[in-house]
């Protein structure tokens, strides 16, 4: 509640006047659980508003996706001069946002006004994720609005995040059961394409984008070439954690 706010937006993630998709995971699930465990029902409206506001400012009606961030001041070079949106949908940003939704929904009561808006956003994400799933690997691309384009690649961290989100959303009844097939295809593809086990049994998870952002001292333009040329590395915590979470959801299915 005391987190600094951007004018016309929600919590400040990194900079004033901006809202980033990935920023929702860093605060909203904790906020929702804290409100639930401490009997603070008035906070639910604020939590819901965080998600809805971010979705509204980052939504791209041309493809149904959500772009990485929005700058309502329109002063950043990466921001569209009309919408304030960044140029692309970064897979991991949308993955963080999807995970934030399914985790926060656990603690927001079914009768809460606005909860249906979160379910609608989550269902739209499920539709787009199904549509953009790579048929060969079962994963998702680093730059989702340029899936399959030259230089783009199927990236492991966003893939793990979408798999987890779909598994959990199906289990909790947030989305239709038909999306289980998408999650299962993604999980099998993840094992086949991103998991390497050496002769000593050491597991490596490959092809994770190390980091991506916007602006900063070494300016990050947010254009297509920027995203596809960021460092790729193995065993990044941002893929290890979501893959473990996805695996726990998968194992629930086997019981």
Could you tell me what each predicted segment is?
Residues 119-187:
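A beta-strand-loop signature enriched in Asp, Gly, Thr, and Trp
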Residues 2-9, 13:
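Single conserved hydrophobic/aromatic residue that forms the stacking wall/gate
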Residues 1, 40-57, 111-129, 175-193:
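Extended, well-ordered alpha-helical scaffold segments
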Residues 56-68, 120, 131-145, 191-202:
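Catalytic cores of carbohydrate-active enzymes
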Residues 44-105:
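Loop-centered beta-sheet repeat module
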Residues 28-40, 96-114, 160-175, 231, ...:
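Well-ordered alpha-helical scaffold segments within catalytic/enzyme domains
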Residues 11-24, 79-99, 110, 114, ...:
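Solvent-exposed loop and edge beta-strand segments that line ligand/cofactor-binding
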Residues 1, 154, 158, 163, ...:
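CBM-like carbohydrate-recognition segments
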